Amino acid sequence: MIEFGDFYRLIAKGPLSPWLDILPAQLSAWQRESLHGKFKTWFNAVEHLPQLTPTTLDLHSGVRAEMSPPISAGQREGMENMLRALMPWRKGPFSLYGLEIDTEWRSDWKWQRVLPHISPLAGRTILDVGCGSGYHLWRMIGEGAHLAVGIDPMQLFLCQFEAIRKLLGGDQRAHVLPLGIEQLPELAAFDTVFSMGVLYHRRSPLDHLYQLKNQLVTDGELVLETLVVEGDSQQVLVPGDRYAQMRNVYFIPSAPALKAWLEKCGFVDVRIADMAVTTTEEQRRTDWMTSESLAEFLDPHDHSKTVEGYPAPLRAVLIARKP
């Protein structure tokens, strides 16, 4: 079973220590009552991975680990078999001892769009909400973050993160917890909070913005990346049953509307840092994620529209500060 004791000890003497009033009980209850039916299978794959310590680790330009001398072909094959037991891999890519995990999303492209616009992460304590497999947590560590904490209730993502951590030498600078943001107390302890690819899944987007704000220190920075539509500050798309085949998409504002929402929630220095159309090169079917992807979610005759007739995915990055 995944143990969280190292994380508890890590935060016990710092600004996150009040979290320990409820966190151990929450995670104990999760382990008793909420495990996914496939969790034991996933965790078994993690346990059967070798504990490797890379001789070369690059978290700055990617997530890459190498060993000298290199691992044997047999070791690499065994490692690949265990990692394939954790499919589908959605966020990455990862390059591990000669094995390339080509994930559905080129999350490195998103990072390249985000990084130039944010405050330097060196020495910061960071929260990544909806962190997935934790790819961006490792990139945050690569930028010098003191501690990167990810939360995501999807248990496969937790196992994927622990698998990567094991192959990176058990690195304790990044951690993933199987929680949603609504389960966090108002910690007001993170220097930077990221919410990337989450807002449109929330039934109450303004509540989500307040939840993010409540995790930030005074003068802390919010990095918000989400789907948007074209339009002025009054433009918001409320999809019907599905958007790009996703059922749980509730509100897609324009970037100016989202800026107004952030200001309404009390954020200051709000700016629209980047906007980019999602392409079928950035999100696609791969050998590590073999089901449908963006190409199947767009109108086959007009890629400017989804199969439902809505505007195709356009993503924006907004930066804001908690006063």
Swiss-Prot record:
Protein task: Catalyzes carboxymethyl transfer from carboxy-S-adenosyl-L-methionine (Cx-SAM) to 5-hydroxyuridine (ho5U) to form 5-carboxymethoxyuridine (cmo5U) at position 34 in tRNAs.
Organism: Yersinia pseudotuberculosis serotype IB (strain PB1/+)
InterPro entries assigned to the protein according to its UniProt record, in alphabetical order: CmoB (IPR010017), Mo5U34_MeTrfas-like (IPR027555), SAM-dependent_MTases_sf (IPR029063)
Protein name (record): tRNA U34 carboxymethyltransferase
Subunit comment: Homotetramer.
EC class: transferase
Chain sites annotated for binding carboxy-S-adenosyl-L-methionine: 91, 105, 110, 130, 181-182, 196, 200, 315
EC number: 2.5.1.-
Protein family per UniProt: Belongs to the class I-like SAM-binding methyltransferase superfamily. CmoB family.
CDD domains: AdoMet_MTases
Protein keywords: Transferase, tRNA processing
Keyword Transferase attached: yes
Catalytic activity entry: carboxy-S-adenosyl-L-methionine + 5-hydroxyuridine(34) in tRNA = 5-carboxymethoxyuridine(34) in tRNA + S-adenosyl-L-homocysteine + H(+)
Single Gene Ontology BP annotation: tRNA wobble uridine modification
GO molecular function ontology, one term from the record: transferase activity, transferring alkyl or aryl (other than methyl) groups
